[in-house]
Curated annotation (Swiss-Prot):
The lineage of its organism: Bacteria, Pseudomonadati, Bacteroidota, Flavobacteriia, Flavobacteriales. Part of the high-affinity ATP-driven potassium transport (or Kdp) system, which catalyzes the hydrolysis of ATP coupled with the electrogenic transport of potassium into the cytoplasm. This subunit acts as a catalytic chaperone that increases the ATP-binding affinity of the ATP-hydrolyzing subunit KdpB by the formation of a transient KdpB/KdpC/ATP ternary complex. The keyword Translocase does not apply. Its main location: membrane. InterPro entries: KdpC. The gene is kdpC. NCBIfam families: PRK00315.1 (NF001454), PRK14002.1 (NF010606). Keywords: ATP-binding, Cell inner membrane, Cell membrane, Ion transport, Membrane, Nucleotide-binding, Potassium, Potassium transport, Transmembrane, Transmembrane helix, Transport. GO terms for cellular component: plasma membrane. It comes from the Bacteria. The system is composed of three essential subunits: KdpA, KdpB and KdpC. Signal peptide: none annotated. It is found in: Cell inner membrane. This is Potassium-transporting ATPase KdpC subunit. One of its GO terms (molecular function) is P-type potassium transmembrane transporter activity.
């Protein structure tokens, strides 16, 4: 009976700790974060067009394309594909993405394509690409929008985020919003 009472106390304690105290602590911490933990929105003319930390699908030729998504940019189903580099289906999918990039960007060589442009991230919702991933698309964007290539390249360079730790990145949504404002 003593053991049963001890186990019951432990169960109630862990239930209160993990079902009440921990969620309230996380909620309190989130309230201290920018935008009270609701996510950092990107707005155009007062209308929210997306979130800074969640990738979106851009497939029109006059926009910069982001990283491929294993979940077709479905935030509710955030996940990677779980297919490794030895999986034949995965290799075929990566090759298809390479072929598509080479077809749309005939001036590129296979070796010019950065890995992040043909592989999905672990979350499937990565909002960023490498600066090289953006720069290889400059010629296509400039042609589609009838803009000076140097102007588009300068825009990309102005949107490169340098992290204290980790690689430089470019947020695709922020870049495309700025691109729409470019004249």
């Amino acid at each position: 009976m003593k053991n049963l009472f001890s186990l019951l106390k432990l169960t109630v304690f862990t239930l209160i700790l993990f079902a009440v105290i921990y969620p309230l602590a996380i909620y309190g911490i989130a309230k201290l974060a920018p935008n009270q933990g609701k996510g950092e929105t990107i707005s155009v003319n007062g209308k929210v067009v997306g979130y800074q930390k969640i990738g979106q699908k851009f497939d029109k030729s006059n926009y910069f394309w982001g990283r491929p998504s294993a979940v077709d940019y479905n935030a509710a189903g955030s996940a990677g594909s779980n297919k490794g580099p030895s999986n034949a289906d995965y290799l075929a999918l990566v090759q298809k993405r390479i072929d598509t990039l080479l077809l749309v960007h005939p001036y590129l060589k296979k070796s010019d394509i950065p890995v992040d442009m043909v592989t999905a991230s672990g979350s499937g919702l990565d909002p960023n690409i490498s600066p090289q991933g953006a720069l290889i698309q400059v010629k296509r964007i400039a042609k589609e929008r009838m803009l000076d290539e140097a102007k588009v390249k300068s825009l990309v360079e102005s949107k490169i985020n340098t992290a204290v730790v980790g690689p430089e990145t470019v947020n695709v949504l922020e870049l495309n919003v700025a691109l729409d404002q470019l004249k």
